[in-house]
């Protein structure tokens, strides 16, 4: 579990989304996309970055580490949760161009979070291109805001959800209802870790169950 993580806050080309350099792994909902398209278009800005990751590159790490060691951060503070946040601005064109070149050698980027935000930003960019047929590619609408984390600095945590109540059902009624879509297997007192895709751990009334989606 790494205690320090660093990322790059950058603008990423929508063309890399369109040509599948940026890999997606979730489907999106049209209504959520439409809501975000309206938001980005009205604000004329990406107000939340897309969380991207990539296979770590020593050459990129070295440039970032060297800059961080040679310069003071523009922001340095401890949040209420005790986590220290520091931000550096890379404002040397030579260093920036070098990083752009090195990232050009990264084969793929992967969306860790932000499928709806990225899809919406790309669609707004395409709308702006259609409205500006003489665009050069340098306009801001050709990019979206993103943070890039090397994979070695990621830690994937459990995606747990706590349900407030059973909506009037008893535990027995809940388990019976679940059998319509899941195989429900009672387990021991130890927490259930999903062993495969389509499986879930359920903790209710002091007991654990393994839920497996029926075909």
Question: PLM ranges: what are they?
Answer:
Residues 4-215:
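Surface-exposed, charge/polar-rich loops and edge strands
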